[in-house]
Amino acid sequence: SNASSEIEYENAIGWLVGPEGRGINTIIEMVNMTRLDCVIGSAVNMRVATLRAVHHARHRKAFGALLVDQPLMRNVLADLVVESDAATTMMMRLAGATDRAAGDEQEAALRRIALAVTKYWVCKRAPAVAAEALECLGGNGFAEESGMPRLYRESPLMSIWEGSGNVAALDALRAMVKQPDTVDAFFTEVRLAEGADHRLDSAISRVGKELADLENVEYRARRVVELMALV
């Protein structure tokens, strides 16, 4: 699915691409881009899996009716579509913030916090979406020819590359503590829709309460990031 290997260069010539001793700072921008790549990969994986599930349901009959016309299957497909569309929307928003970050402090701050939050949530949700979509195909989904097994095998990888769940959650906390403007940028963004739905307003309020006290927050970092992602 995604073959990996390790390469060792012996007696190779190398050039510094940044100040000596500042490797982490030099590479961090590359890491930001590859984290965005991971979000894109997960969103695409979710979308392909969802489309295959919908296509199958539109053509497969069971108990005398197409699967897509049966209420329980429609419910499952609706959940898949909503989650896939949300991942795609967030991915596009992050890509836009990345394009504008160099000349816009608000976008740069949003990108800093949202990239860590989205890397955690979207990449972690991809395997669950792939598994649910595979189930929609039944036994056919387990057959290699369906393409679903490959999606299922690939789906966990993006959550591991460029910082697994704990790393992404702790990076989000680091941004909140060291760059408080990232928190302001987050709330400015989500409050654009404030008032549209009381459930959204409650979710925003809950995140605000969670972030009001960042002392001893590390043990609940994953939960905080999950709440931010779901807003």
Regions from the PLM with identified roles:
Residues 189-231:
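C-terminal amphipathic alpha-helical interaction region
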